[in-house]
Design a protein with these regions (language model features):
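An acidic site on a long C-lobe helix of protein kinase domains
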Residues: 27, 31, 85, 155-158, ...
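Conserved helicase C-terminal RecA-like lobe
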Residues: 44, 58, 62-64, 90-333
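Well-ordered alpha-helical segments embedded in enzymatic catalytic cores
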Residues: 27-34, 88, 207, 291
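Acidic, low-complexity intrinsically disordered tails
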Residues: 335-341
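Short alpha-helix plus adjacent loop in nuclease-associated cores
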Residues: 75-97
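Active-site-adjacent beta-strand anchor residues
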Residues: 21, 51, 75, 82, ...
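Structured loop/turn residues at secondary-structure junctions
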Residues: 23, 53, 77-78, 213, ...
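Helicase P-loop NTPase motor core
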Residues: 1-71, 96-98
């Protein structure tokens, strides 16, 4: 009988980095900056990956990657702007920004129970022929905004409810975050009725709410999302051609068996990784620990683990501040600490 001994042929190399950021967006901007730096050093995008515990963890990063013109493919979930429920919420915001947006009107009207294509067409026709004419100076003053939303008593009650909600948040002095908050309150019953996995989708929308907090105007938000008017519930992710270079975004489950030169593991934060639910049993916590091991062993040369130090979790009502228990306490001889300022 022979004794088995495990060893590595690789020697030397740099220490993994543990990077703390003040906010989620600061974490995202740091990762984008490092991706660009590694690319300048000769590491191709296809040799880099960003890994995360849950699909919604990449949403803020996806916006920053889009702004930086970094192409990416996502595995283990839809891209942020390709999910039907996020497109729904953005449609409400698009209408507040541009009341002539027929595609967005059709989208949100058809979400209403009892409203079919014929009713939606009548409402949209009235909007284009009568209301827009009443408020040609829609963006210039609150009085113009009031004119646009006046006199809709002839609409069905469920459509009036939509108009009431939009009227209450149409004023230009209301922030995108506040507008989004009221839209989500209105939309939540629709979400529950339309999707069996509404709890999972609600987390996506909570993340979207957090993202809107840093914007002062809806047009800035829509520009960063780089959205065309949404006309489909789901957009297919195009497969890259043989000459296309792209960054990989992936859930850890989808990254098993794969390796990259450079790997970022984001949201190494108590409540995110491990998740709050995993604390219920030892078995679930061990599964989380195993996933962290899988994530960290995907890197061949460079491993960067990041976490934001102050984020609000809508589901639990907690403010998450502690680094993941899986990395806390690791000595500086094994993990190089960095702070983003």
């Amino acid at each position: 009988m022979y004794t088995k001994e495990l060893f590595t042929k690789k020697s030397g190399g740099t220490l993994p980095q543990l990077v703390s950021a003040q906010t989620e967006n600061q974490q995202s901007r740091y990762v984008v900056q490092k991706i660009l730096e590694y690319r300048e050093m000769g590491v191709p995008l296809e040799e880099m990956a960003v890994l995360f515990r849950s699909s919604f963890h990449s949403f803020d990063l996806e916006i920053e990657l889009t702004k930086a013109n970094i192409p990416f493919l996502k595995f283990g979930g839809f891209k942020f702007i390709e999910t039907a429920h996020v497109k729904d919420v953005i449609a409400y915001l698009r209408i507040l920004e541009n009341p002539r947006d027929v595609i967005s009107w059709n989208r949100i009207l058809l979400l209403i129970d009892g409203v079919g294509p014929r009713t939606a067409e009548k409402v949209v026709d009235d909007i284009l022929k009568r209301r827009v004419g009443l408020a040609k100076e829609f963006k210039e003053a609150v009085t113009a905004t009031t004119k646009f939303w006046m006199d809709y008593g002839n609409y069905p009650d469920n459509v009036c409810k939509l108009f009431n909600m939009l009227k209450d948040i149409a004023a230009p002095n209301i922030s995108p975050a506040e507008k989004t908050f009221h839209i989500l309150q209105y939309y939540e019953p629709i979400l529950r009725a339309r999707y069996e996995d509404h709890l999972k989708r609600k987390k996506d929308l909570d993340t979207f709410q957090n993202i809107t907090e840093r914007y002062k105007a809806i047009d800035e938000l829509l520009t960063d999302l780089a959205l065309e008017p949404p006309n489909e519930s789901i957009v297919d992710i195009e497969s890259p051609g043989p000459e296309t270079e792209y960054l990989t975004l992936s859930t850890i489950h989808s990254a098993k068996g794969l390796e990259w030169n450079t790997v970022f593991v984001i949201y190494a934060l108590e409540g995110r990784f491990p998740t709050l639910r995993s604390a219920a049993t030892d078995e679930e916590m061990e599964e989380e620990r195993r996933l962290m091991y899988v994530a960290c062993t995907r890197a061949k040369e460079h491993l960067i683990i990041t976490y934001p130090m102050n984020i609000y979790d809508h589901e639990s009502g907690l403010i998450l501040t502690k680094p993941s228990r899986f990395i806390e306490g690791i000595g500086e001889n094994l993990l190089e600490p960095w702070v983003v300022e």
